[in-house]
Amino acid sequence: MLIPREFFLQLGGFDERLETGEDYEFCQRACAAGADIVNNPQLRVVHHDFPRTLRQFIRREAWHGRGDLRSLRTFLQSKVALGASAFLVAHALILTGLFLPGMLSLLPLGLLLLILLLAASTWKKYRYAPWHSRFVNGGLFYAYYLGRSASLLYLLQRRSGRTPRLA
């Protein structure tokens, strides 16, 4: 992120109270103050501690997802948090359809919701990519939403008084 120091200080810098998403929140304030956010693909970004395994990726997304759960407002404004909620609902429908007698009709509904969520996410992000790449990224979106929905479960556990643990 490149920004004049004076403007950064005028906006109050990053909100240090935020566990995650402080850069996104800062950009929202900058836009509200009249800044234009421009993505320059020629600039290279290095992320330290980039996940090297699927488990690390899911854990990182679970941590990132906690930023969307600061308040009901941030939750409702986050397409990702809403997508993670749909992910959980789809799995609840699938499991209910599989394991509760007389509820088999919920199985196709849950599968449809899950497929639509993954397809819409993949289409939005990779609509210009080759078809085989879209299928692979659909699988990665499954892991992405698995991590993001884990942060929702983390919040529910914390609110219920249980000690949450992200594996």
Task: Explain the meaning of each model-derived region.
Residues 1-12:
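Conserved nucleotide-sugar donor-binding
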Residues 49, 54-104, 128-134, 164-167:
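Basic/Trp-rich segment in TM-proximal cytosolic loops or flexible interdomain/linker regions
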Residues 15-76:
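Catalytic donor/gating beta->alpha subdomain of glycosyltransferases that bind UDP-sugars
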Residues 86-159:
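Membrane-embedded multi-pass helical conduit in multi-pass membrane proteins
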Residues 12, 49, 157:
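Short, flexible helix/strand-to-coil boundary loops that buttress conserved ligand/catalytic motifs
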